[in-house]
Amino acid sequence: QMVLENLHRWNINTDYLVTLDDVNTGTAHITLAEGDNSIIVLLGANARVDESIVDGAWDAISKADLVMVQNEIPLKTIGYITKKCAAAGVKVLLNPAPAADLEVEWLTQATYITPNEHELAALYPVNNTDDIIKANAGKIIVTLGSEGVAFGKDGDIHKVPSFKVQPEIG
């Protein structure tokens, strides 16, 4: 209930939010050390996001400019979302965190993929990450923690530095 109240306080649309009485919401516990974070994820109710929930929100999803999905819901549901969005022409940003084995089809169907360096290595197990980034120019944006992001464009690797933010608790 507290999470729902906070979403309302920030004017976040909760029309398609599903609450379950027998399980807590998913949470992520973040530790920060020297500009890099480590995240412990407890899936909670997120583990129950399934095709029926996606279908129940499909009217809104199908009209979206971009749908962001990450590995904090069941992998089967990620596959369902990417396939359905690709068929409808809806762009998908796939954040493959936490790292997991994803189907190649889902990676192909995603418009953008935003792994960190470890997730990139898990998705594309080759030695040269620069080659992966270049080969997927316009698709893969690698998050580099305190170093910013890297992406491929015009046969080169481009990096955008991060900027300092003040972590907030609440």
What are these regions (language model features)?
Residues 1-66:
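Conserved N-terminal subdomain of the carbohydrate kinase-like
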Residues 40, 123, 152:
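Residues that scaffold the ATP/ADP-binding catalytic core of kinase and kinase-like folds
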Residues 42-44, 115, 162-164:
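Active-site donor-binding loop signature of nucleotide-sugar glycosyltransferases
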Residues 58-62, 107-108, 134:
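A short, aliphatic-rich alpha-helical micro-motif
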Residues 66-131, 147-149:
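Conserved beta-alpha-beta core of the PfkB/ribokinase-like small-molecule kinase fold
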Residues 101, 128-170:
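Conserved phosphate-binding/catalytic region of the ribokinase-like
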